[in-house]
Amino acid sequence: MIVPRLALPISLALQRVSRRVAEHPHNLRILQRHMSSVYFRSGAIKPKPEEMPFGLLAIFCAVIPGLFVGATISKNVANFLEENDLFVPADDDDDED
């Protein structure tokens, strides 16, 4: 159901782009430059970029400590708010199951 809804706008957009390219051939060069990061000016394909070894481990080493620091900060703020009577959760709110 979603695909037919998207098919018409996509086809209309492609028709507009093809009309613009047909009217002004220099627009084709602009479109080609947009995708030129894969190719050299000579047309040769650039080599595959180097992958970082242990990239997934580096992500975990950055995300996990961030989660713990965020949880600690939020716990301390919640305790501060409750100690100073700025926000005290009501016990009767938990019985609404």
UniProtKB/Swiss-Prot annotation:
The family classification in the record reads: Belongs to the SMDT1/EMRE family.
Q: Which compartment or compartments is the protein found in?
A: Mitochondrion inner membrane
Q: What is this protein called?
A: Essential MCU regulator, mitochondrial
The record's statement on gene disruption is:
RNAi-mediated knockdown in muscle results in mitochondrial calcium uptake defects.
Q: Which GO terms describe its biological process?
A: calcium import into the mitochondrion; defense response to Gram-negative bacterium; mitochondrial calcium ion homeostasis; mitochondrial calcium ion transmembrane transport; positive regulation of innate immune response
Q: What does this protein do?
A: Essential regulatory subunit of the mitochondrial calcium uniporter MCU channel, a protein that mediates calcium uptake into mitochondria.
Q: Where are the transmembrane segments?
A: 53-73
